[in-house]
Design a protein with these regions (language model features):
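A short acidic, Gly/Pro-enriched loop at the edge of an enzyme's catalytic core
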Residues: 82-92
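Conserved beta-strand signature within the Rossmann-like core of class I S-adenosyl-L-methionine
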Residues: 122-129
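Conserved SAM-binding strand-loop segment of SAM-dependent methyltransferases
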Residues: 66-78
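A short glycine-rich, Lys/Arg-flanked "PGG" loop and its adjoining helix->strand segment in the class I
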Residues: 108-121
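Conserved SAM/SAH-binding beta-strand->alpha-helix loop
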Residues: 50
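Conserved SAM-binding loop
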Residues: 57-58
Length: 166
């Protein structure tokens, strides 16, 4: 069961049934399972740095995992590599992830640089902190990431390694 806060986050996501979704900082997997229920023709990959969180997520997700609709992995976003057949992702979301909410700016730069490679060209990134979410724009151009004024942006002058889904 989702908390009211996580339910509001999931409800705010612009989800389509065929999306590939990445959740960063999935904790025990409640939001990942809720999103997986809404993407019956897609996939949710949920990651967390905590082994305990991933163990809890896996324990509560047997049916969705068996159906190939959700996968959990213990890894930091900076080190995450999609498995064959996964990605690029249409949507990425994160709730209370220090690398993306401004608490850890150096890790944030690494995380957003990694997300440039993981998202489709039209992929969207949402983090908590809005009402209930805010979208983080990944701009093309010189790489930048500014936590000081509450605005977030990152970009690349060239995009490499993107492949289109067929």
């Amino acid at each position: 069961m989702l908390s009211a806060r996580l339910a509001a986050v999931v409800d705010a996501l612009p989800i389509r049934p065929d999306m590939q979704v990445l959740e960063i900082g999935c904790g025990p997997g409640a939001a990942a399972r809720a999103v997986a229920e809404r993407v019956p023709d897609g996939l949710v990959v949920a990651i967390d740095r905590s082994g305990k969180a991933i163990d809890q997520a896996v324990a509560g997700s047997g049916g969705l995992m068996a159906a190939g609709r959700v996968r959990f992995e213990r890894v930091a976003i900076e080190d995450f590599v999609a498995e064959p057949g996964e990605g690029p992702f249409d949507l990425v979301f994160a709730v209370r992830v220090g690398a993306l909410d401004g608490r850890h700016p150096s890790a944030g730069e690494q995380a957003l640089a990694r997300l440039c490679d993981l998202l489709t060209p039209t992929g969207r990134l949402f983090i908590d902190g809005g009402d209930p979410l805010r979208e983080v724009r990944l701009d093309r151009g010189p790489r930048r990431f500014d936590f000081t004024d509450g605005r977030y942006a990152v970009g690349r002058s060239a995009v490499h390694g993107r492949r289109s889904r067929t």
